[in-house]
Amino acid sequence: MSETTPVPVGEAGEKSATALKKEQKKLEKEKKIAEAKAKKAAEKSAASGNSGEQKNEKKQEQVEENNSNWGELPMNQSKEKITREWTDVSQLTESLVGKSVLIRARLSTSRLQGANLCFVQLRDGLYTVQAVVAKGGSNSKSMVQFVGQVPKESIVDVQATVVSTSVPIESCTQKSVELQVSSFFIVSKSTLLPLQIEDLSRAQPLLDKQEDDLKQLEQLLQNTNLNEQEKTDLEKKKSECIKFVNVSQEKRLDNRALDLRVPAHQSIFRLQSGVCTLFREQLLGEGFIEIHSPKIISAASESGASVFKLNYFNTHAYLAQSPQLYKQMAICADFNKVFEIGPVFRAENSNTHRHLTEFVGLDLEMTFKDHYHEALDTLDRLMTSIFRGLETRFAKEIESVNTQYPFEPFKFTYPSPRFTFDEAAAMLAELNDPDYIVKDNDFNTRQEKRLGKIIKEKFGVDFFIVDKFHVEVRPFYTMPDPNNPQWANAYDLFMRGEEICSGAQRIHDPELLEKSAKSHGVVIEDIQGYIDSFKYGCSQHAGGGVGLERVVMLYLGLGNIRKASFCPRDPTRLTP
């Protein structure tokens, strides 16, 4: 059969429509997917020009975060020994221009100039230098921003090239050079400072003037006749007058570790160290032996109540008021010339500008052949050699102190002017002022200062000696004057009208010593060992004790002994 079998139209039509519908949906779905892909590709292609730069910057930032020339170093626990060549800020001079140096210092200040430049002041003790961090080469923008955000007083390691400056950098000690930084790392990061170093470093004359101006305005405000507008104007002037933070002495001492970072204060203690060094050098050169006496003793070393009492196991002990008795025991042991640098304790409730309950004593004792003035000559020679040494070896430190605390240069001559107590009292009496008539056989503080001014006017010096004091105002071991038992072979040394040393010929006869001790109220049993040491023969001897902090205070004209004490102790302060 050649004919085809007919297919029912209805059945064939229904099947064809369903298949077409499914195929249509499939095609539409595929089309949407294709369009979405095309759109995404088109957007990606259209944005390729701008997004390329953004991606590059992002990648660059990621690289910079891992940069090897800036950041914060891990804590140094001495894991390994590394040999590197370091340069002190003080060594940065024009002789190093063009050379690469490695510096460790404190970040004193930082100043961002836009996004790509930062100026930093680095401080190392007394010395400061400017460092510049600029974008370029291996220095990234992130590095510049990082340096600009390093907290003040952080300790940093800086690798840099020394370059000369066309204009002196007046804000730094190293004025003729600066550093072009190539690496910058934090060694020890500082937290928020309770006091700013800038405030602690402020020149005293600026603070004094501000205080004077404020007092004057305050006095004007006390006028009850002022109208409201006048009061408002004065209050405004008072507010405008306050330009500087005036940090009190108490706040400085409460934050002593920060206060001592100030260059002027660093210099004070370098000078203090210098006084000890010069004291030791001079006496060693004259044949003295350095000794170290005990500070916990069984009895008060001086008469009086100014002694710290301690519980010592099952008995009582005292803190030594001086090494006096032990210096003399050394003389009895034929040491002949001895000195000591050590702590001295005085339980005196004296809240003055020149008293401390603990200070450093510079003591000496020596035998003499004919007259106690041999010892006085030694003291004169010693002190003037110290003054001379400070001038020649510590000029930079003196200049640094003078910048913050201006003072007149210390004047002295050798031999120094000497006066008896009566001669000095007569100079004061010439003023015809009842306040300067010497009573009680000794000078008071006001009389001492006035005497210093008189001698400065007449002799042009700040250092002088007064000899032959009344025996009743000297310790029990002081030798009386054989020509007049009311006087003593005793002397004081003065700087700028304040006593810095008391000394005398000592009693070396045990019977006279015991008699004198009894007359001064000393319990003989407590010092029997001391008295007995003179029973086996003892050379005549003399000496003195100098207060270290007082010497530094007066030489630099500081006005308060607490500035010359590392961590001062007075009746109200036991910390830090």
UniProtKB/Swiss-Prot annotation:
The keyword Ribosomal protein does not apply. Residues 324-327 are annotated as: Aspartate. GO terms for cellular component: aminoacyl-tRNA synthetase multienzyme complex; cytoplasm; cytosol; phagocytic vesicle. InterPro entries: Aa-tRNA-synt_II, aa-tRNA-synth_II, aa-tRNA-synth_II/BPL/LPL, Asp-tRNA_synthase_2, Asp/Asn-tRNA-synth_IIb, NA-bd_OB-fold. GO terms for molecular function: aspartate-tRNA ligase activity; ATP binding; RNA binding. It is found in: Cytoplasm. It catalyses: tRNA(Asp) + L-aspartate + ATP = L-aspartyl-tRNA(Asp) + AMP + diphosphate. ATP binds at residues 346-348, 354-356, 499, 547-550. Its EC number is 6.1.1.12. Residues 20-43 have a biased composition (Basic and acidic residues). L-aspartate binds at residues 302, 346, 502, 506. CDD domains: AspRS_cyto_N, AsxRS_core. GO terms for biological process: aspartyl-tRNA aminoacylation; response to bacterium. Residues 1-78 are annotated as: Disordered. Keywords: Aminoacyl-tRNA synthetase, ATP-binding, Cytoplasm, Ligase, Nucleotide-binding, Protein biosynthesis. The keyword DNA damage does not apply. Belongs to the class-II aminoacyl-tRNA synthetase family. Type 2 subfamily. PANTHER family: ASPARTATE--TRNA LIGASE, CYTOPLASMIC, ASPARTYL-TRNA SYNTHETASE. NCBIfam families: aspS_nondisc (TIGR00458), PRK05159.1 (NF003483). This is Aspartate--tRNA ligase, cytoplasmic 1.
